[in-house]
C-alpha cells in the first residue's frame, strides 16, 4: 500500500505498475533466498538472525526489561543477572554490534510477524525497495534517457534481486544508499 501512495515512490518516475512489479520481483527473490538457505544451507546467517531475534522477542515474556535491554541497550557489558545470562547465552553475535543491529531490527519485527520468517522478508524487501528506488531517482538525474535500462539493472540484477532482498545485511545496505 505504501508503495502506491507514498510520494517518495510515486514521484520516482516509475509507474505504479512497475513499482509493484519491482516489489513483487524483490519479494520473489527474498522468499527464494529464505527457502534456499533453509533447505540447502542449514539456515545460514539469515535464519540465525531470525531465530536469535525470536529469542530476544521471547525475553519480553520473561521480563520486559530484558527485552528492552536486548533491543535498545548496549551489548558492551557483561550481565550478572543469571536469568538474563540464560537468555543471552544462545543469542549469537551478542557482542558484535554491527551484526547485532540486524537482530535488533528483527526482534522489533517479531511483534508484527508473529514469528513468521517470510513476514520479515516482506518488511526487509520494503526496506531494500526504499534504497533501490532512491538509487533509481539519483541515476535518473544523470541518465534521463536510460530509465528502462536502469530499472532492469536495479530490479533484475542478480545480486540486487537475490542478495538485496533477503533478511540479511545487504538489504539494509541497499536502503542506506
Residue map of PLM features:
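Transmembrane alpha-helical segments of multipass membrane enzymes and assembly factors
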Residues: 10, 109-113, 134-148
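Loop-to-helix entry region of an early transmembrane alpha helix in multi-pass inner-membrane enzymes
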Residues: 92-104, 112-130
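Transmembrane and membrane-interface helices of multi-pass
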Residues: 150-157
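Specific aromatic-rich, kink-prone transmembrane helix
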Residues: 134-137, 173-177
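Start-transfer (signal-anchor) and selected internal transmembrane alpha helices
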Residues: 1-31
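Transmembrane-helix motifs of polytopic, lipid-linked glycan transferases
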Residues: 2-5, 120-142
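Short acidic/glycine- and proline-prone juxtamembrane loop motifs at membrane-interface regions
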Residues: 166-169
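Extracytoplasmic catalytic/substrate-binding loops of multi-pass membrane glycan-assembly enzymes
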Residues: 37-52, 61-83, 93-105
Amino acid at each position: 500500500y505504501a508503495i502506491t501512495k507514498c510520494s517518495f515512490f510515486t514521484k520516482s518516475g516509475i509507474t505504479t505498475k512497475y513499482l509493484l512489479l519491482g516489489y513483487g520481483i524483490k519479494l520473489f527473490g527474498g522468499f527464494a533466498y529464505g527457502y534456499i538457505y533453509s533447505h540447502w544451507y542449514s539456515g545460514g546467517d539469515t535464519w540465525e538472525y531470525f531465530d536469535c531475534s525470536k529469542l530476544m522477542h521471547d525475553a519480553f515474556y520473561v521480563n520486559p526489561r530484558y527485552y528492552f535491554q536486548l533491543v535498545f541497550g548496549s551489548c558492551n557489558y557483561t550481565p550478572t543477572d543469571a536469568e538474563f545470562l540464560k537468555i543471552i547465552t544462545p543469542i549469537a553475535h551478542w557482542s558484535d554490534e554491527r551484526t547485532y543491529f540486524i537482530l535488533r531490527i528483527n526482534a522489533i519485527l517479531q511483534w508484527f510477524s508473529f514469528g513468521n520468517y517470510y513476514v520479515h522478508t516482506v518488511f526487509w524487501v520494503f526496506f531494500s525497495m526504499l534504497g533501490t528506488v532512491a538509487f533509481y531517482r539519483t541515476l535518473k538525474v544523470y541518465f534521463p534517457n536510460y530509465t528502462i535500462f536502469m530499472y532492469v539493472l536495479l530490479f533484475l540484477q542478480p545480486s540486487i534481486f537475490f542478495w538485496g532482498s533477503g533478511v540479511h545485511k545487504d538489504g539494509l545496505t541497499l536502503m542506506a544508499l
